[in-house]
Curated annotation (Swiss-Prot):
EC number: 2.1.1.199
Taxonomic lineage from the root: Bacteria, Pseudomonadati, Pseudomonadota, Gammaproteobacteria, Vibrionales
Cell compartment(s), UniProt: Cytoplasm
GO molecular function, one term: rRNA (cytosine-N4-)-methyltransferase activity
Protein name stated in the entry: Ribosomal RNA small subunit methyltransferase H
Gene: rsmH
Xref: InterPro entries: RsmH, SAM-dep_MeTrfase_MraW_recog, SAM-dependent_MTases_sf
Pfam families per the UniProt record, alphabetical: Methyltransf_5
Amino acid sequence: MTASFQHISVLLNESIEGLAIKPDGIYIDGTFGRGGHSRTILAQLGPEGRLYSIDRDPQAIAEAQKIDDPRFTIVHGPFSGIAEYAQRYDLVGKVDGVLFDLGVSSPQLDDAERGFSFMKDGPLDMRMDPTSGMPVSAWLAQADLDDITWVIREFGEDKHARRIAKAIVEYRENELNEPLTRTSQLAKLISDAAPKSFKEKKHPATRAFQAFRIYINSELEEIDTALRGASDILAPQGRLSVISFHSLEDRMVKRFMRKESQGPQVPHGIPLTQDQIRALGSAKMKTVGKALKPSDQEVELNPRSRSSVLRVAEKL
């Protein structure tokens, strides 16, 4: 039985304002989720406007198919394929705005069967698209100590990465133990491995669960490819509006927008003529305003918005 979950879109008004919607414009919502941003964009489009939304989660696709609107098209796939989809629909250089709402939607987190959360027992899966790729349980069953440590440290920024990885490997190698296939098993294992001096407000498993989710879904590679694809398909003055949810994502977005706004960097002392420097290219984008965080009121209404950051850039 499928449960019904409420999903509150984060920084909804701010991210849509960042797109500077034109009624007859062409827009792409790279992360449909449960459609909060997409429906808001559609409400601001006129009869000639178009919205293309992307998601690789079958549940999100099912939700999108409820939208009966000739201006709307849903694409099933990873948002890293945005440039490919733009070519398919002849949109390259014509897109007036792209929105990315990174991270996991509330229904994904709240549905125990998806295996994203340590708060509810469920299969240890964590795949954004359950029809492809390897679940976390299968990866943990074969990964070595160094690989598990690296993933937790790199993508979870957890200072106890080695300690947690050792606990997982030791558990796995004990033939008396059940296979590690449930979120509750992994959460308890990590909690037990945490030092008694653990002081953080967050659950001890928070960072490790984040790390495994990012790794199993290749999230950072997806984001990097998606950002570059979005820059390539935007029309002049087209906007890129990106909401991130943790420091790894936000650093990627910040560095990307800074790099695109600076153009090629030529080291001092390299003897190049002005023509040669111009041939290297120029800045592709400019940042719009400052990074925005949710208001105290939004955080109170939706605690999951607390860590979110919105950044906006415009194609030159």
